[in-house]
């Protein structure tokens, strides 16, 4: 796992995003998919909204996924394994990139076939505690012609990476292959989810510079 951590840190430092495969093994992905939460997820999860707290609204013309937040204190063992791995990654990022990440939040996500999420930024204007976005995909045997890619709109040259360097504006597509993890700057990288021809599953989260329970105090 240390090799994965090193690759993630190098990517974040150099270009503001990183992608690694096999962050979760196929066996670990299957164990998550077999949880009751992911069986008939569209029926059990809540329709995701846009905005935060009191300003939140449902708008399927912008966002079409369903989510269920993970309770870190009560999560099932397959999810706990993933969360512990995230905690180790946070510690590694803090040590190597001199960040001050203090907590994280994660929800289970399902996009029904044909649904999407239009271009957006993860960090809210009124709440800048989301520093890094992190997504782990749970889709076995995914084929590129099924679509569903995450499209990142990479920052213009005047927006620095964690090492203070910029890059040309361009897009980067990431297909939602099982076990693949993508991590990127929540404050800089706008992104969108393109429609897929089949259901698309992931664990979607954010690394924070504030404890979750203190964010709204």
Model-derived segments and their meaning:
Residues 3-92:
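Non-heme Fe(II)/2-oxoglutarate
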Residues 35, 39-41, 96, 141, ...:
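Phosphate/oxyanion-binding loops and surfaces in catalytic or ligand/nucleic-acid-binding neighborhoods
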Residues 99-107:
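A short coil-to-beta-strand element that immediately follows conserved catalytic motifs
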Residues 125, 130, 139-162, 167-217:
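Catalytic core of Fe(II)/2-oxoglutarate
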């Amino acid at each position: 796992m240390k090799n994965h951590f090193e690759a993630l840190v190098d990517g974040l430092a150099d270009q503001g995003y990183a992608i690694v495969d096999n962050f979760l093994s196929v066996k670990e992905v299957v164990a998550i998919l077999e949880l009751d939460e992911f069986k008939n997820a569209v029926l059990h999860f809540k329709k995701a909204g846009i905005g935060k707290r009191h300003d939140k609204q449902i708008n399927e013309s912008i966002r079409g996924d369903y989510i269920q937040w993970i309770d870190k204190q009560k999560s099932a063992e397959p999810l706990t394994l993933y969360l512990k791995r995230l905690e180790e990654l946070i510690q590694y990022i803090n040590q190597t990139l001199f960040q001050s990440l203090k907590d994280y939040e994660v929800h289970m996500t399902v996009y029904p076939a044909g649904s999407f999420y239009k271009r957006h930024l993860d960090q809210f204007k009124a709440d800048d505690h989301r520093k890094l976005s992190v997504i782990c995909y749970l889709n076995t045997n995914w084929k590129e012609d099924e679509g569903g890619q995450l499209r990142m709109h990479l920052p213009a040259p005047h927006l620095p990476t964690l090492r203070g360097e910029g890059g040309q504006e361009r897009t980067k597509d990431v297909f939602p292959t099982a076990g693949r993890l993508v991590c990127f700057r929540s404050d800089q990288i706008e992104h969108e989810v393109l429609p897929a021809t089949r259901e698309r599953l992931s664990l979607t989260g954010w690394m924070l510079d504030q404890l979750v329970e203190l964010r709204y105090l």
